[in-house]
Curated annotation (Swiss-Prot):
This is Max-like protein homolog 2. One of its GO terms (molecular function) is DNA-binding transcription factor activity, RNA polymerase II-specific. GO terms for cellular component: cytoplasm; mitochondrion; nucleus. It comes from Caenorhabditis elegans. The gene is mxl-2. Residues 47-60 are annotated as: Basic motif.
Length: 205
């Protein structure tokens, strides 16, 4: 009786033992977790996170470097000395400095226009001098005429410099006409110059 029970128990355990064996006779566990796949997924997630952190760090370093370069380009002001420099303060100073540069450029353009107008007027005077000089006889022929012409031109240039406004082309035209009228024979400045020409002591060569 006990022998038959032992045989039955042995036969009931054989199917379980056979389930634990693989077709090639090795033991296997069908419910064991897939460890390599799990590790691979975790490694990929860590790598993405590390890449994201590295990119974010590089982005912040680039921003900080840009702010540092901008800070070096902006001149220091008395109000910024001794104060903590923030990014907002750097941007504010940059905007203020740009406004100042625009004002300086505008003033420089106005000054350049004024200098160009003055240069144009001086070129015109130089051209007139050249024409007058070409019509003057040789010094050996008429020294007195040369000295008279020199006195007249010097006096004219002095009055021209004091009466002609070189600010703009419009002011040059307006004041130049007034200056030309002052050279009329009946004008007092011309009479004064003519009197100097007549009374000055000339010496013959």
């Amino acid at each position: 009786m006990s022998r038959s029970r032992s045989a039955a128990a042995s036969s009931s355990q054989k199917p379980d033992d056979m389930d634990l064996m693989s077709p090639d006779g090795s033991a296997s566990s069908p419910s064991a977790p897939n460890t390599p796949a799990t590790n691979s997924g975790g490694f990929s997630s860590d790598r993405k996170k590390a890449t994201h952190l590295r990119c974010e760090r590089q982005r912040r370093e680039a921003i900080n470097s840009g702010y540092s370069d901008l800070k070096d380009l902006i001149p220091q002001t008395t109000t910024s000395l001794g104060c903590k420099t923030t990014n907002a303060a750097i941007l504010f100073r940059a905007c203020d400095f740009m406004s100042q540069l625009k004002t300086d450029i505008s003033d420089a353009d106005k000054q350049l226009a004024q200098l160009n107008a003055q240069a144009a007027a001086l070129e015109m005077i130089a051209s007139e001098y050249e024409q007058m000089a070409s019509s003057v006889p040789d010094a050996g022929q008429s020294t007195i005429q040369v000295k008279m012409l020199q006195l007249l031109l010097d006096d004219c240039f002095t009055s021209f410099s004091s009466q002609v406004d070189f600010t703009t082309y419009a002011t040059i035209t307006r004041t130049l006409l007034s200056w030309v009228e002052s050279l009329a024979p009946n004008a007092e400045p011309f009479k004064s110059t003519a009197g100097k020409m007549v009374t000055m002591p000339f010496t013959s060569p």
